[in-house]
Curated annotation (Swiss-Prot):
Primary location group: cytoplasm
EC number(s) given by UniProt: 2.3.1.274
GO cellular component: cytoplasm
InterPro entries for this protein: FA_synthesis, Phospholipid_synth_PlsX-like
Pathway: Lipid metabolism; phospholipid metabolism
Subunit structure: Homodimer. Probably interacts with PlsY.
GO molecular function annotations of the record: phosphate:acyl-[acyl carrier protein] acyltransferase activity
The species this protein was found in: Streptococcus sanguinis (strain SK36)
The UniProt record lists the keyword Cytoplasm: yes
Name this polypeptide is given: Phosphate acyltransferase
Family the entry assigns: Belongs to the PlsX family.
Length: 332
């Protein structure tokens, strides 16, 4: 049985979205057990799953405006902290939260702990592409600054994730840069390029540009945390803007526009689904001793369900265990 600790009080739509997502996941997957950490009185009205769900009551929670490290240290009974402690103690195999990202990173680093020889765990998420396959990108903001060595480790971690969780054989690894030529980039990117191209265990395809990311140019894209977070926000914002503009044009375009939209409804639905990052799950703080996954703060029940499904796959394929073995002896 795979045990997943859920911070039921984190996020904009907590606890309703978290609990409703849990209801669906428990109904669909018979091999998971959920530990819900939070205010029992607020959780129970939404809980329909009677089996394999246990509520661990606490009224303390970490707010979105709390200082991350301070909150983790001072709010020892917060739902997020208790979920992380359950993972560390072996009472749960993984944890999920839609709460304060910085606090979750701190809980992952200081409570769950890093895999030996991984210097900086990175935040990894599967991003949408036009072709529908998507690509895994890290780091998406766990670290503001990185070295070339960190980027090399991210390439290995990303390859492990793409191959084991998403089933991609020999995933293509690209280094995000301001040009595709090997001579492009600042000293960080140039040094990282040398490390990646010299690693025969990676299917490194070279530099990739941001404009090509959604065209299935690579399966894994490596970036420093600052750049990766900026790209993530750009992709999210662009997807929302495109769908918003389409809706505005259809509603304001009169009868012909509405008729055209009706005729194209299947195609438009496909476009919407291809840009929906929530269906892929959450962002994994990869490089820790157990899966710690952050779902978007505004996640609905569907996104929470998708994240639980993602965690289940991570546990089923033992991607973290394989990463531990890979890094048990430092490669560099």
């Amino acid at each position: 049985m795979k045990k997943i600790a859920v911070d039921a009080m984190g996020g904009d739509n907590a606890p309703q979205a978290l609990v409703e997502g849990v209801n669906r996941a428990v109904q669909e997957f018979s091999d998971i057990e959920i530990l819900l950490y939070g205010d029992e009185a607020k959780i129970k009205p939404y809980l329909t799953a009677g089996e394999r769900v246990r509520i661990i009551h606490t009224e303390e929670k970490i707010d979105s405006d709390d200082e991350p490290t301070k909150a983790i240290r001072q709010k020892k009974e917060a739902s997020m902290v208790l979920a992380a402690k359950a993972v560390k103690a072996g009472e749960a195999d993984a944890m999920l939260s839609a709460g304060n990202t910085g606090a979750l990173l701190a809980a992952g680093f200081f409570i769950v702990g890093r895999i030996k020889n991984i210097d900086r765990p990175g935040l990894l998420s599967t991003m949408p592409t036009v072709g529908g396959q998507g690509f895994d990108m890290l780091d998406l903001g766990a670290n503001a600054e990185n070295t070339a060595h960190h980027l090399h480790q991210y390439a290995t971690l990303g390859s492990f994730y793409a191959e084991n969780v998403r089933g991609i054989k020999k995933p293509r690894v690209g280094l995000l840069n301001n040009g595709t030529e090997s001579s492009k980039g600042d000293p960080l990117r140039k040094e990282a390029y040398e490390l990646l191209s010299g690693d025969s265990t990676l299917n490194f395809i070279g530099n990739v540009e941001a404009r090509d990311l959604m065209d299935d140019v690579a399966d894994v894209v490596v970036a420093d945390g600052f750049t990766g977070n900026a790209v993530l926000k750009s992709i999210e914002g662009t997807a929302i803007s495109i769908m918003g503009q389409l809706k505005k044009s259809i509603l304001g375009g009169g009868f012909k526009a509405k008729l055209g939209a009706w005729l194209l409804k299947d195609s438009l639905r496909g476009l919407k689904n291809s840009l929906d990052y929530s269906s892929a799950g959450g962002a994994v703080l990869f490089g820790l001793k157990a899966p710690v996954v952050k779902t978007h703060g505004s996640s609905d029940a569907k996104a929470v369900y998708s994240t639980i499904r993602q965690i289940r796959t991570m546990l089923e394929t033992d991607v973290v265990g394989k990463s531990v073995i890979e890094f048990s002896d430092a490669k560099e």
